[in-house]
């Protein structure tokens, strides 16, 4: 019957629209596009399913062509264990055929400064959070287990950046973390 066909078509159209909105699949580019979705999507998705967003975004992009490569941005956790767990969860969901076609960039999120009062410098809380994240990245990169075999998680991380406009947060807030991590040479002892 035509009513069922019409309803099914409406369902498919809405489902496609919703999926594209969730994974930011549209014609707009830049941070404004990213920021407009990032805050909202976590409100509707349970934390247990959040890693599936990366599967949908990465595979959705890669399946549209054979010569594609994507660098997905992820916010680093503040412990080595948190970083390993999140990257492992993202990687295990993505189809094996795309294994060499994606990587990750650790993405520090800028925030508006909340003044703490006299005696505290600008972005006091954010600088401490970034310090914890930078140290966790250092530990993650230094741990031999994260380099080994098919679970070479460190090799999947190819960069580091800070997101958002400089209106709310100036570059020097991240300078120490970037200098610390840039100078981090990895040497893995052979046993």
Residue ranges and their predicted role:
Residues 1-191:
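Metal-cofactor-binding active-site regions of metalloenzymes
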């Amino acid at each position: 019957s035509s009513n069922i066909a019409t309803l099914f078509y409406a369902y498919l159209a809405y489902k496609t629209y919703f999926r594209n909105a969730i994974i930011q699949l549209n014609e707009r580019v830049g941070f404004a596009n990213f920021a407009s979705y990032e805050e909202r999507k976590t409100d509707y998705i349970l934390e247990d399913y959040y890693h599936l967003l990366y599967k949908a975004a990465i595979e959705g992009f890669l399946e549209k062509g054979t010569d594609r490569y994507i660098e997905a941005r992820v916010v680093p956790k503040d412990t080595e264990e948190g970083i390993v767990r999140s990257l492992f969860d993202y990687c295990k969901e993505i189809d094996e055929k795309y294994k060499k076609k994606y990587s990750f960039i650790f993405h520090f999120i800028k925030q508006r400064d909340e003044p703490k009062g006299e005696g505290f410098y600008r972005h006091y809380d954010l600088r401490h959070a970034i310090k914890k994240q930078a140290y966790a990245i250092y530990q993650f990169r230094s741990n031999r287990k994260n380099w080994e075999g098919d679970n070479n998680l460190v090799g999947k991380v190819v960069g580091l950046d800070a997101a958002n406009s400089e209106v709310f947060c100036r570059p020097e807030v991240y300078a120490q973390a970037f200098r610390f991590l840039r100078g981090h040479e990895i040497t893995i002892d052979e046993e």
